[in-house]
């Protein structure tokens, strides 16, 4: 895992077309802004896990049919 330190207003660049900017820090939370092409899906980890769980359930249902 790459670990980087950024201050508010500073940006990371991922690949050629994704930027992640630190917008603010409040206590133990940070606000980030992400610019990426529409074709790139961006989810919080817990939402991504739910999506994957639903896909797995759907695959099992289709396998049973």
Swiss-Prot record:
GO terms for cellular component: cytosol. One of its GO terms (biological process) is negative regulation of translational initiation. One of its GO terms (molecular function) is mRNA 5'-UTR binding. The keyword Cell division does not apply. Keywords: Activator, Cytoplasm, Repressor, RNA-binding, Translation regulation. It is found in: Cytoplasm. The keyword Repressor applies. It comes from the Bacteria. A key translational regulator that binds mRNA to regulate translation initiation and/or mRNA stability. Mediates global changes in gene expression, shifting from rapid growth to stress survival by linking envelope stress, the stringent response and the catabolite repression systems. Usually binds in the 5'-UTR; binding at or near the Shine-Dalgarno sequence prevents ribosome-binding, repressing translation, binding elsewhere in the 5'-UTR can activate translation and/or stabilize the mRNA. Its function is antagonized by small RNA(s). Belongs to the CsrA/RsmA family. PANTHER family: CARBON STORAGE REGULATOR. HAMAP family: CsrA (MF_00167). Homodimer; the beta-strands of each monomer intercalate to form a hydrophobic core, while the alpha-helices form wings that extend away from the core. This is Translational regulator CsrA. It comes from Blochmanniella floridana.
């Amino acid at each position: 895992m790459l670990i980087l330190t950024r201050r508010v207003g500073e940006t990371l660049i991922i690949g050629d077309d994704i930027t992640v900017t630190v917008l603010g820090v409040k206590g133990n939370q940070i606000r980030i802004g992400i610019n990426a092409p529409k074709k790139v899906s961006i989810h919080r980890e817990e939402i991504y896990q739910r999506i994957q769980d639903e896909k797995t359930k759907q695959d099992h249902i289709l396998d049973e049919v």
